[in-house]
Amino acid sequence: MVLVKTIKKLDGFIECLLMLNYKFLY
């Protein structure tokens, strides 16, 4: 399903942003 793929992409994108935030914070 396209919806599931989109959600997985968004999840990966958010995870990437969180990792970047952690790098900047510490």
UniProtKB/Swiss-Prot annotation:
GO terms for cellular component: chloroplast. Keywords: Chloroplast, Plastid. It is found in: Plastid, Chloroplast. This is Uncharacterized 3.2 kDa protein in rpoC2-rps2 intergenic region. It comes from Trieres chinensis (Marine centric diatom). The lineage of its organism: Eukaryota, Sar, Stramenopiles, Ochrophyta, Bacillariophyta.
